Amino acid sequence: LVEFPQRGHWSIGLVVGEPGDVIEQALGEPVMTVFVPTAPNPTSGYTIIVPPREVKELDITVDDALKFVISLGVVAPTGHRLGRPSA
């Protein structure tokens, strides 16, 4: 999970690697590249660069993450149930 598109709003993101030394040197800290897919078509999305401390790792498969995105959040990751939104 990453806070995207703004603080307090969380999105599923897939860690795809490290952007390289040039970007890390420019930012002055270690960072990672995260792809945030759009719903319901995960072939488009946003590539963002964030420090590892801003990424919350989930214990789910990439397949489950993409099912969640494609279903617009209706299909919860395996073994987890989505609660009802509070009124």
What do the predicted segments below correspond to?
Residues 1-87:
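Terminal membrane-proximal soluble interaction domains of membrane-associated proteins
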